[in-house]
Amino acid sequence: MALTREFKETVVARIKKDTHYRRALLAASIDAFLDGNIDTGKSILRDYINATIGFERLSKVIKKDSKSIQRMLGPNGNPRADNIFSIIKILKDDDNLCVYVKIDKK
């Protein structure tokens, strides 16, 4: 089911004004990737990028074309792990975050 433009705009607005929500969204994207839910991880990451650093600025830092990054994170994109981890590193550094992975039993 496709999300409406209004919903996406609401999410972006909240990411911009709510630090806890922004951090939780990045964590949710990373969790999705680690759980093998690649499409979900990419979708959340796109929203996060749109609301924070933006694809143009990200492309300058990562030294890749912004359209290439958008395609990589699009519904049909197939990003390599090194690209995903590079993007996550840039995002966490940009927001002055430290990411930890905690392993527990299910």
Spell out what each predicted region is:
Residues D93-K106:
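Short C-terminal boundary/hinge segments that cap the last helix of small helical domains
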Residues N50-R71:
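Short alpha-helical DNA-recognition segment
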Residues M1-I44:
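N-terminal flexible/basic segments that precede or flank functional cores
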Residues N76-K89:
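Short, basic-rich loop-to-helix N-cap that marks the start of a DNA-contacting helix
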Residues I30, I88-L91:
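Amphipathic alpha-helical interface segments used for dimerization/assembly
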